Amino acid sequence: MAKGKRTFQPNNRRRARVHGFRLRMRTRAGRAIVSGRRRKGRRALSA
């Protein structure tokens, strides 16, 4: 019986486009996410 493929197929360009910093800065909610992560002291603010 054939199994399906793994669902996570890493791709850096897609990762940046979907979760990246520029995308976060585009919307008010995204900026809120980044500022919250800054406040918390996260090492990485976004992908």
Swiss-Prot record:
Keywords linked to the UniProt accession: Ribonucleoprotein, Ribosomal protein
GO cellular component: ribonucleoprotein complex; ribosome
Residues that span the membrane, as ranges: none
Highest rank taxon of the organism: Bacteria
Molecular function (Gene Ontology), one example: structural constituent of ribosome
HAMAP family assigned to the protein according to its UniProt record, in alphabetical order: Ribosomal_bL34 (MF_00391)
Protein name: Large ribosomal subunit protein bL34
Organism field: Mycolicibacterium paratuberculosis (strain ATCC BAA-968 / K-10) (Mycobacterium paratuberculosis)
